[in-house]
UniProtKB/Swiss-Prot annotation:
Record's function text: Catalyzes the reversible oxidation of malate to oxaloacetate.
Enzyme class: oxidoreductase
EC number of the protein: 1.1.1.37
Protein name: Malate dehydrogenase
Any one GO molecular-function label of the UniProt entry: L-malate dehydrogenase (NAD+) activity
Length: 331
C-alpha cells in the first residue's frame, strides 16, 4: 500500500472571517493540496476573534474530514506560523468609511510587518505564502521585505480571482464554455487599475484577439466589469466577495503546488524580475506557469501600445503604494 505524504501545515489568518470560513472546509477536504496530502490546520486570529475561530474549529472537527489530522487556534503569529508549509494571509484591516489611503497602508503595513517577521523566524523552509487581504500586492511586498531569509518569490498576492472573473466574462460574451477559455492574463495591481488582457487568450479554437478587436466591448464592458466586479458584488449583496475569493485562493495554491496545464497559464502577483518593464521587486500580477512547484513568468508575449498603456497605469499605482510604505519605514 502506498504511503501517504507527510501532513502539510496550513495556516490561515483571518480564519474567523467570511473568506476564511469559505476556505477552510475545502482545504480540509483536500481540494487545495490534493486528495492524498493530510492537513494540519492552524487558525490565526486577533484575540477578539479567537472564540469565533474556535467555533469554526469545532465545525471542522464535526465534519470528520479523513485528511484533517489536527486543528489549532492561535492569536500569536509565532505559534500560528510555526512549521507552516502554506500560509494564506487573509486577515487585513479593511478600509472604513472616511479612511484615507495612507491610513489603510499604515494599518496593514504594521500587520504584515509582524507576520513577515514571524514567518521568517518559524515557518517551514519551503513555505509558500499567499496574501489575500487588501491591498494585497503591497501587503505581500511588506511581508516579503520583513522575511529576508525566505526567497522573495515565495510571497505572492491573489489575482486569481480577477483571472477567474475575466474567464467568466469572456465565456459569457463569446458563448464558449469556461473550460474552453485559456491564456487570459491579469497585469498589475489587484485594484480597479488592473488590466485583464485577452489578446493572447484562446476561446476554443478562436483567438482572444478576435474579441479584443471589438474595442467598444473591450473598453466599455469587459475591462471595467472585471476591474470593478468586487464593488458590484458589495453593492448587490451588501458584503464583499467571500466564496469566490476563497475559491480563487484554493485555485492559486493548488496550481502552485500541483502545476498548471501544459497549454494554459494563470495570473499571480509576485515580485517582478524586471519582466515586461515592471520595476524589479514590485509585486505585480503577471501571466505565469507553475513548473516543478515554482512560478515562472510567461515570457515572449507581444505587448501592443494599447496594453502597454494600461499595464503602465496599474504599475504606476503599485509604485506609489510602494513609495508610501517605504516612507513609513515598512520596507
Amino acid at each position: 500500500m502506498a504511503q501517504s505524504p507527510p501532513p502539510a501545515v496550513v495556516t490561515v489568518t483571518g480564519a474567523a472571517g467570511s473568506i476564511g470560513y469559505a476556505s477552510l472546509f475545502r482545504i480540509a477536504a483536500g481540494e487545495m493540496l490534493g486528495p492524498d496530502t493530510p492537513i494540519r490546520l492552524r487558525l490565526l486570529e486577533i484575540p477578539s476573534a479567537v472564540s469565533a475561530a474556535e467555533g469554526t474549529a469545532m465545525e471542522l472537527d464535526d465534519s470528520a474530514f479523513p485528511l484533517l489530522r489536527d486543528i489549532e487556534v492561535h492569536d500569536d503569529p509565532k505559534r500560528g506560523f510555526d512549521g507552516t508549509d502554506v500560509a494564506l494571509l487573509i486577515g487585513s484591516r479593511p478600509r472604513s468609511k472616511g479612511m484615507e489611503r495612507g491610513d489603510l497602508l499604515a494599518a496593514n503595513g504594521q500587520i504584515f510587518t509582524v507576520q513577515g517577521r514571524a514567518l521568517n523566524q518559524v515557518a517551514a523552509d519551503g513555505v509558500r505564502v499567499l496574501v489575500v487581504g487588501n491591498p494585497a500586492n503591497t501587503n505581500a511586498l511588506v511581508a516579503a521585505n520583513n522575511a529576508p531569509d525566505i526567497p522573495a518569490e515565495r510571497f505572492t498576492a491573489l489575482t486569481r480571482l480577477d483571472h477567474n472573473r475575466a474567464i467568466a466574462q469572456l465565456a459569457r460574451h463569446s458563448g464558449a464554455a469556461v473550460k474552453d477559455i485559456r491564456r487570459v492574463a491579469i497585469w498589475g495591481n489587484h485594484s480597479s487599475t488592473q488590466y485583464p488582457d485577452i489578446f493572447h487568450a484562446r476561446v476554443g479554437d478562436r483567438s482572444g484577439a478576435e474579441f479584443a478587436a471589438d474595442r467598444e466591448w473591450l473598453t466599455g464592458d469587459f475591462i471595467p466589469t472585471v476591474a470593478n466586479r468586487g464593488s458590484a458584488i458589495i453593492e448587490a449583496r451588501g458584503a464583499s466577495s467571500a466564496a469566490s475569493a476563497a475559491n480563487a485562493a484554493i485555485d492559486h495554491v493548488h496550481d502552485w503546488v500541483l502545476g498548471t496545464p501544459d497549454d494554459d497559464w494563470t495570473s499571480v502577483a509576485l515580485p517582478s524580475t524586471g519582466a515586461y518593464g515592471v520595476p524589479e521587486g514590485l509585486v505585480s500580477s503577471f501571466p505565469v506557469r507553475s513548473v516543478d512547484g515554482s512560478w515562472q513568468i510567461v515570457d515572449g508575449l507581444e505587448i501592443d501600445d494599447f496594453s502597454r498603456k494600461l499595464i503602465d497605469a496599474s504599475v504606476g499605482e503599485l509604485e506609489s503604494e510602494r513609495d508610501a510604505v517605504r516612507g513609513m519605514g515598512f520596507i
